[in-house]
Amino acid sequence: MKPLGRRSFLAAVSATVSARALGRTPTAGTLRLRLPLYFGGIDPHSADDPLSALFAPSIADPLFALDANGKPYPALASALPERTATGSRITLRPELLSARGKLLSAADVVFSLKRTQGSGGAAVLGAFRPPLADGKDRLSLSVPEASPEALARALANPLTAIVPRGFSPTTPDGTGAFKATLGSSSLTLTRNESAARGAAFLDRIELSRASDLADALRAFETGQVDVGWLGNGLYRPKASALPLDGPIFGWIVLRTGLDAKAWGAPGIAAQLTAGLPGSALTRFGIRPLAGAGDGVRWGGGPTSLLVNEDAPYAVELARALESLLSSNGNEVRTTPIPRTTWLEARRARRYGLLLDFVRAANGDVTQSAQALLSAVDPALARRPPKNLNSVLDATRTLTLGIVGEVRVAGARSPEFEGLDTWQLGSVWLNPERR
């Protein structure tokens, strides 16, 4: 099956609208959002940042992508991987420019793959040897001992997106449909005219940081933004709004640490999250996973639930979890701390309980399980359990339990077409629906 590019997608959609609209080229418009998330940077290789999970695929592309049948096809690569006597060979498309004007070569691919192998990409690249640039061809690289088929599938994962050498999350760059500019509490995406797979249809996407969920919903109700994050207004629904029902982009997870002592043993976290009532988490856009089984309440004595103080959504959710996890004499208390302190506590496992996020890169059960395993220990992702029926099967022996999956949801202004797919480069403004 031949995949649809962004321009072909538009042509297909345009065929369904009025004849008067067929001649219009909808390359205009600004989409506004307010989100209660941490605005510390955009990193395509991050597996623990919701903002990056939502918007990094709009600024950076992987070497391959998957068609509607789940088969890899070339995106930034000129062809599918070639089998060689020592492994697999990949050649980059020529003349690829990043949004900030950097010409890409195989050296940038090697940099990107090594970078993500030490970060979020460890989940899918842990089984592969480090890539090697071809000294005679600036566009080619090899991956020793790699199967071309397995390599192409792994390198279609958004966590393996290609970025220029010297990449920084605070000045993000890539070949995607948008160019990103980060502010202290804002993110602006503008059309990238040199995008490798076609520039965005919208002129720009403007994001600002909400102080909490209520702030995000109020902004939609009063017309300040075009997306109601996780709902349609704070006090009353917006009459003209349409439902927004997009893809899963990750899981909220609960970690048990060394300070939990016996309650920090593998499998306890999964039991704690299994007992959480889904109805109490609905307003957070969280859907518990089916088949979690019977749960337990916290029994390890009074403890803190650590959370990044710069992530309003996570802080609000943690406070809602307090009463759901606590039992008499075993009170759980939300403790917001600076992100650097939170990261160090997570690394050393010096906590009783800790609230975290793990990015879901696609719907493949094995790769999803690898992401969760890697969040505990990247070495575990190299040997995921076989015959998985659910990602829950991968967490029953971990120090991490799934609170629930989080998806793009809420409400949207009707003039923005294609938002439900969350392929932001393909979203376009339909003036007839204003």
Residue ranges and their predicted role:
Residues 34-85, 91, 114, 173-174:
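N-terminal lobe/hinge region of extracytoplasmic solute-binding protein
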Residues 37-54, 76-77, 102, 149-160, ...:
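A structural "hinge/loop" feature
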Residues 55, 79-121, 140, 262-264:
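Aromatic- and charge-enriched surface segment that lines or borders ligand/interaction sites
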Residues 82-85, 121-166:
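Surface-exposed binding/hinge segments that line
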Residues 105-112, 140, 204, 222, ...:
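Alpha-helical secondary-structure segments
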Residues 147, 152-206, 211-215:
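Gly/Pro-rich hinge or "lid" segments in bacterial periplasmic/extracellular proteins
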Residues 181-190, 206-259:
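Extracellular/periplasmic solute-recognition and catalytic clefts
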Residues 184, 273-296, 312-322, 346-434:
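Detector for C-terminal structural segments
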